[in-house]
Amino acid sequence: MGQGESTPLSLTLDHWKDVKTRAHNLSVEIRKGKWQTFCSSEWPTFEVGWPPEGTFNPSIISAVKRIVFQETGGHPDQVPYIIVWQDLSNSPPPWVPPLAKIAVASGQDNGRKSAGGRPSAPSRLPIYPETDSLFLLSEPPPYPTSPPPPPAPHAARPAPGLMAEGLGSEGPAAGTRSRRPRSPTGDTGPDSTVALPLRAVGPPAEPNGLVPLQYWPFSSADLYNWKSNHPSFSENPTGLTGLLESLMFSHQPTWDDCQQLLQVLFTTEERERILLEARKNVLGVNGAPTQLENLINEAFPLNRPQWDHNTAEGRERLLVYRRTLVAGLKGAARRPTNLAKVREVLQGPTEPPSVFLERLMEAYRRYTPFDPSSEGQKAAVAMSFIGQSAPDIKKKLQRLEGLQDHSLQDLIKEAEKVYHKRETEEEKQEREKKETEERERRRDRRQEKNLTKILAAVVSEKGFRGRQAGNLSNRAMRAPREGRPPLDKDQCAYCKERGHWARECPRKKNARETNVLTLGDQGSRGSDPLPEPRVTLTVEGIPTEFLVDTGAEHSVLTKPMGKMGSKRTVVAGATGSKVYPWTTKRLLKIGQKQVTHSFLVIPECPAPLLGRDLLTKLKAQIQFSTEGPQVTWEDRPAMCLVLNLEEEYRLHEKPVPPSIDPSWLQLFPMVWAEKAGMGLANQVPPVVVELKSDASPVAVRQYPMSKEAREGIRPHIQRFLDLGILVPCQSPWNTPLLPVKKPGTNDYRPVQDLREVNKRVQDIHPTVPNPYNLLSSLPPSHTWYSVLDLKDAFFCLKLHPNSQPLFAFEWRDPEKGNTGQLTWTRLPQGFKNSPTLFDEALHRDLASFRALNPQVVMLQYVDDLLVAAPTYRDCKEGTRRLLQELSKLGYRVSAKKAQLCREEVTYLGYLLKGGKRWLTPARKATVMKIPTPTTPRQVREFLGTAGFCRLWIPGFASLAAPLYPLTREKVPFTWTEAHQEAFGRIKEALLSAPALALPDLTKPFALYVDEKEGVARGVLTQTLGPWRRPVAYLSKKLDPVASGWPTCLKAIAAVALLLKDADKLTLGQNVLVIAPHNLESIVRQPPDRWMTNARMTHYQSLLLNERVSFAPPAILNPATLLPVESDDTPIHICSEILAEETGTRPDLRDQPLPGVPAWYTDGSSFIMDGRRQAGAAIVDNKRTVWASNLPEGTSAQKAELIALTQALRLAEGKSINIYTDSRYAFATAHVHGAIYKQRGLLTSAGKDIKNKEEILALLEAIHLPKRVAIIHCPGHQRGTDPVATGNRKADEAAKQAAQSTRILTETTKNQEHFEPTRGKIKPRELTPDQGREFIQRLHQLTHLGPDKLLQLVGRTSFHIPNLQSVVREITSKCQVCAVTNAVTTYREPGRRQRGDRPGVYWEVDFTEVKPGRYGNRYLLVFIDTFSGWVEAFPTKTETALTVCKKILEEILPRFGIPKVLGSDNGPAFVAQVSQGLATQLGIDWKLHCAYRPQSSGQVERMNRTIKETLTKLALETGGKDWVTLLPLALLRARNTPGQFGLTPYEILHGGPPPVLASGEVVGSNGDFFPVLFTHLKALEVVRTQIWDQIKEAYRPGTVAIPHPFQVGDRVLVRRHRSGSLEPRWKGPYLVLLTTPTAVKVDGIAAWVHASHLKPAPPGAPDESWELEKTDHPLKLRVRRRRNESTA
């Protein structure tokens, strides 16, 4: 037969499966159609000699590859196909013909000649095909080309094909990363088995030059192996850190290789942390880490640098970069200091000590900032190693002598000795086996010894009885009687015949034997076996003989006799344990009876066994007689009931149980309230009621009462009087009595309104159990119950006589002669603490009952008791003991409400039956009778009543969701069909409420969770055999933030929400969470764009708990099957859903698009002349594209959004790069915009977010450009690159746009001023002593600082020599100022809004001054912001009425109506009274920023000044009466020069301070100008200087200087918690050490910040020595005491 010619193309198509496998191994994908098209049509057009039928010639394939890989004009879509062709050429498969292989080999050898012109050795095929890098499809970086190798002697010119393979730097393949076949010889290149990025390609070009390096990038296989064979950096950073450290110093990667390693091996967050830590470790010129940005960018650039690895400088840069990157890796691997993590590292049972030490040191490196290998930490590591080692090693190491002198190596040696001396597992098993055998041998020997003794006793007894006739008590043998002939051996002693003995003589009558069972009796069986009790039963129609074995728990068959079940049981025997199966139900016939039973199948059993299980079921009886044991069955006659058909319903009626068995009433007559009367707890002391510290008696008049109501409660009051529970009294306390009519009767019961008393009584923590989870502690196995209700429980506790007057009430009964007040002698009802007090008292009294009766469980809820037991007998016994205990303690039980020893009881509104809880019919009827609501309050009442039953209603939150909006008061109430439908569905669900199992705390729980329409729904279950029983149905609505998340994240919130509710029932037991999402992976690697760190930490603390586990995702579970409106959720992958719902536009980029114009946007907002101006602009590098001013008050964030939105609109249909320096605008466009849209643009509080309209406009405009990239750039940079220049231009254009529409008018100051015509005042000279005395008295009067005191003295008519030095000396020595004044804080002064004349703008604030005087506890302070004039008024309360009164009585008459009032958001200022007064007077009341006292800085500073002045005056006068000292403090405040050297008095009144108005301070008379001239002088100053200076804006301050404290200085330290009239500073202390920011002082252990220190005044010593007596008469104690009398 003929055969057609095969071509390379036909061969590949015939073996296409192998070709496709080869492509898959190369990590590329190819198609059969394109393969044929490229080979036959495309590649022949390249004109490189490619035939249409294909070829395996390497040179032709390389030529095609060069064209495909060209940077310009290349063919990226053909890259995978030519790569596979080249791989088939380099590694021919078996189906390639031999001629083709020879052609391939010859093509590979072409041009490869040796230096002498001889051909090189033939190429050897590689074992594994080399895989090309995954990065072949991306554009390669511009790596510097390697230098050519040095010329070798007689070297032949390389072939052109070899040049094209990459050794040359020209041609279309220059700069590509293609992998060519490597030469097998070692002469032409490095070893191909080592993937070094930089490889030496030959000797250096110069004698002392560098070895040239050639770049080879990492292969994808290397990266994949490193990624897959090492744990993630977050789990265990040691592996990747060690890998990269070895790669850095062995493979010499370039900058791009380092970025590739970071990109592949680390996550984004890990990579950013590593780069940040690395930049922190860049070393400066001094060898220490530097903070200079230029040095950091130079040594560790974030963008690709132009480093040439073939130069010395380039290699040095790469070396520094690698070292810094390794330091960053180690820094990022370090976790926050957590010594608890170190203590958790314990040695495993089989872990070698050296491995454990390595794990321990790694924990030190990760969780502490210490280096465990340093000398200073070796002791700590050694102690941890000893304490956390295995018990045997720890015991050995702790016994070492001189433990502190042993090194870690010594400890390791000792630990290794103990470790290697341990038994192996085989040795341990062998030893245990030998010990077991030895114990068995000893037991066998002991049993044999005992048996030998028993047999010896039996034998000796037989011998003794046989010798009684002639040998007793070791006497000699008796001689035969005379006259009786001797007997022969075979002669009978009875008949004298031969042939038998006497006991066998037939003539002898047998004597009657005594029925005594002894071993020697004739009637014993001896060694004969006892008769075995056996019975024959018919099993599945086959008669089977069973051996009755009462010691066997289960009945046994030796053969299955039918189908086997799945149940297995472990049977432990003498030879070990083995698992045996069970049969299914088998039918047994026993006489006329038929029963079904499961048998245990044991083939090794000698006979079928009838065990206790089947004997019990058959009610068998075993009788033992002389004939043997007999087994009989109970056989009762059948009974039938004949009745009429119409009477059959009586069989199904539920019998009405009697209230209580009369026998209980007779057994315990003193415990029933109906027989014994009122109870009294005899072991509880009288209750004392504690009042609040500020409580005062309250008397509330009695409400009017109808005659019917009074007559209705009179019998109850009289009964309590007769019993002594009520007694007459006279008390300042009085509360009203309310008669409440009992439903369905004409009887009334008295109820006392104790609300006013409850307000004045101290609160105690309520310890009453929560009825929601009280039943969780009731085991489901306890199905017999008794319920007791204590009668008049609170009246069982006595009330202390001192507390009785608190509960007095008014009562008038003229017929009985009672007129006045009555009060309770027992604990009253209506008192808020009565339930807690009674619950605790009863709990203490019944503590002994709980301890002595563990067989029952008793639950207590105030006065309701529940006793539960597994059996009726235990329940009855426990109830009897409880009644005895209650009778002895003095409590009384209601016989009408008692439920004793029942399987079904009602407790706390639940119906308990069979280990389950049900809703009572009365509870259901209550909800069903609720009419349709008509008001929001009625809706809330319905939801509250139905919410009690929500555990029984699946998906209650979903059903009630339409009703929740109607519960709001201010929302219009409109009842629609949807509301009526929800109302009806809740009632229908209540009627079909299922039974819920009681939680069994010995079993784990399973929580099924699902989320639909923002509602979390779940089912809490527990297993019962193969089924899961529901314990509770849970449902809850998610908060507004979580409701806007993707479905997968909403499931996380739902699980966390329901898990907290389930914990109330599970009480900390293990919970298995089952949901239709992969929750565990999301929780462990949460998306950082959707939720905050605080919320994610909260979820992880709840869900990543050792008691919470996650099951695989289940699309269908009981929670997903709960009723909903629609369910069309598809199966999905959570990670993909989260990725899809993150961005606002799929192709939006944060990196610049190449070849696209760039725009720069910016928004500006600033305050000018008290108004906030704003503008926005868009510029490019040449012109302003758009600029506009924005409305007054626009914030900077809003301006940035407007600028970015406008840029997107202007770029409609274009490709554009938009730069912005706003993080807010950038994050909104890339991340937060989609999140806001998902949430409905709501905050976590359910309110609209800020800039809502601008964000919506941005989200719409972001889709207008054809292609867009929004890039964030740093703002206000000084560089010359285009980005920094464009950003500065945009900022300038925005500022200009903000001011573009403002009309600036130039105002000139009034140059006219008063010229004095009488000259200046001539100052009076004072002597130095007079000047010092004057300054001293002036400072004692004002306690001003040096600068203010200088200004004040400078305005007097006195001249004092050396004024500055005298003032500073006196102020520095003042002890009162030193311990009171605060340190000047170096802050930049800000701008504040002020009035333009006195009395226009006031600031007001309350401040508390302790201790209060004359009832005044507060100080109301007013300050005029223009002049600084202060008004302060002591007040008793901090109310709005006080503020309004002072404004109307003090401010209004003296200063006129203010235009503006500023205050904080205190209740007194935001009240309707204050705001209403401001509205009526036309005052603009400005409320300052909340929690920002700086916004009320002027009045806050004045509060501090007044308090400091009061403190100084109180210290000097020795009193605490600050109300009396307040005028002096106001005098000081009003006469203190301000910023411009003027006092508030001068600004307001135009005159000098009153303290300087007289010249008699010194005591001499001088020639002074009259007072009128002084006033005129002041008027001139006011008109010319004062007001204009005050209107000037603040000037920025100077930069703060380092602290001046040195070692040896004496300083004062700030008190952080000083009182109102206590000094602020303590000390002095001696400075020991200093740093640029902190100081170490003697006497304080911690370092003190320099801002909390001030120099101590010279004078008093800082310490003194005292002598103290001791107990010893010849010893004295010398104690150093620090002087802090002023502190």
From Swiss-Prot:
Annotated lipid attachment (N-myristoyl glycine): 2
Q: What EC number is given for this enzyme?
A: 2.7.7.49, 2.7.7.7, 3.1.26.4, 3.4.23.-
In chain numbering, motif PTAP/PSAP motif lies across 108-111
Reaction catalysis annotation: DNA(n) + a 2'-deoxyribonucleoside 5'-triphosphate = DNA(n+1) + diphosphate; Endonucleolytic cleavage to 5'-phosphomonoester
Residues forming coiled coils: 408-453
Question: What's said on domains?
Answer: Gag polyprotein: Late-budding domains (L domains) are short sequence motifs essential for viral particle budding. They recruit proteins of the host ESCRT machinery (Endosomal Sorting Complex Required for Transport) or ESCRT-associated proteins. RNA-binding phosphoprotein p12 contains one L domain: a PPXY motif which potentially interacts with the WW domain 3 of NEDD4 E3 ubiquitin ligase. Matrix protein p15 contains one L domain: a PTAP/PSAP motif, which potentially interacts with the UEV domain of TSG101.
Name the record gives this protein: Gag-Pol polyprotein
Species of the source: Koala retrovirus
Q: What is the lineage of its organism?
A: Viruses, Riboviria, Pararnavirae, Artverviricota, Revtraviricetes
